[in-house]
Swiss-Prot record:
The keyword rRNA-binding applies. Pfam families: KOW (PF00467), ribosomal_L24 (PF17136). One of its GO terms (biological process) is translation. This is Large ribosomal subunit protein uL24. One of two assembly initiator proteins, it binds directly to the 5'-end of the 23S rRNA, where it nucleates assembly of the 50S subunit. One of the proteins that surrounds the polypeptide exit tunnel on the outside of the subunit. One of its GO terms (molecular function) is structural constituent of ribosome. Belongs to the universal ribosomal protein uL24 family. Keywords: Ribonucleoprotein, Ribosomal protein, RNA-binding, rRNA-binding. InterPro entries: KOW (IPR005824), Rib_uL2_dom2 (IPR014722), Ribosomal_uL24 (IPR003256), Ribosomal_uL24_CS (IPR005825), Ribosomal_uL24_KOW (IPR041988), Translation_prot_SH3-like_sf (IPR008991). It comes from Anaplasma marginale (strain St. Maries). Part of the 50S ribosomal subunit. Disulfide bonds: none annotated.
Amino acid sequence: MMAKIVSGDDVIVIAGSDKGKIGKVVKILRKGGHVVAKVAGVALCRKSVKPSKDREGGIFSVERFIDISNIALFDSEAGVRTKVGYKFVDGKKVRYLKGSGRVLD
C-alpha cells in the first residue's frame, strides 16, 4: 500500500478520540498491507513499567500507533489540512502540497 505521508510530516488527526490534534509523524510501519503511524503527542496511553537495573519503574505515557486513514497532511503555513501530490522538478520526482503548491521534498 502506498502512503503519501512520511516521517517528519506535520499531520492532523481527522477521526477518533484525538480528532483535531496536530503533531509530527515520528514513525511509519508498513507491514502486511496495513500502514500505521506514530504521531508525537497524539493517542497517548499509560504504560506500567517494572523497575530494572537500567531505569526506574513507574507509570509512563507512550504514543500508540494510529491507522494512516485517520490522519491527513497539515499545511502549517496555511493552517489547513491538505492533500499531497507528486510532480517532476528538474527531472526529479518531488512531493508537493496541492492546496498551496509548496514543495515538501
